[in-house]
């Protein structure tokens, strides 16, 4: 995430160059607190008839992962890429961050119990093309601590069958 994102006008000034590549284009991210920024960006791209093929979300949510259809429809039926995913937000003290934030077995189990449902929702959503777990938060949320210590959620994630990501019919 970028704490000082460019304004929408600056991004749009560069967008035509990106469209010329012919590659699929992903929106700017929905960094924390940026719904209005993302709304303005998508509205302006659509108003101009420009391409934006994919919606990029950062999901530091305590709930709502089962409602990806809302974001898909709100932002013009674009496939969703979640580039940062964690159960909760450290700055809101919710989700796994409502704990003491240690790598304890109890916290690992709590995170695993929640993340199993979240992964299941995302893996079964026709609107989510891909997602990436954000591992750079407190120890209580880690998939991998250090270079080799998998958490319970990390072990689950390592063996999880997520299915096909890209679906041409949604393009």
Each language-model region and where it sits:
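Active-site groove signature of glycoside hydrolases
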Residues: 1-8, 26-33, 49-61, 80-88, ...
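Active-site neighborhood of glycoside hydrolase catalytic domains
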Residues: 8-27, 74-77, 118, 125
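Alpha-helix N-cap and loop-to-helix initiation/capping positions
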Residues: 3-10, 102-114, 148-152
């Amino acid at each position: 995430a970028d704490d000082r994102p460019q304004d929408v006008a600056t991004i749009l000034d560069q967008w035509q160059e990106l469209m010329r590549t012919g590659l699929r284009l992903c929106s700017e991210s929905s960094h924390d607190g940026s719904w209005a920024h993302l709304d303005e960006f998508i509205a302006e791209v659509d108003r101009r008839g420009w391409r934006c093929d994919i919606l990029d979300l950062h999901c530091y949510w305590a709930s709502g992962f089962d409602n990806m259809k809302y974001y898909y429809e709100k932002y013009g039926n674009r496939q969703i890429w979640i580039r940062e995913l964690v159960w909760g937000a450290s700055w809101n003290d919710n989700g796994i961050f409502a704990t003491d934030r240690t790598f304890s077995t109890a916290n690992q189990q709590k995170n695993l119990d929640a993340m199993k449902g979240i992964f299941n929702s995302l893996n079964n959503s026709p609107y989510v093309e891909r997602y990436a777990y954000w591992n750079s938060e407190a120890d209580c949320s880690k998939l991998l601590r250090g270079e080799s210590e998998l958490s319970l959620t990390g072990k689950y994630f390592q063996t999880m069958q997520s299915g096909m990501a890209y679906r041409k019919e949604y393009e």
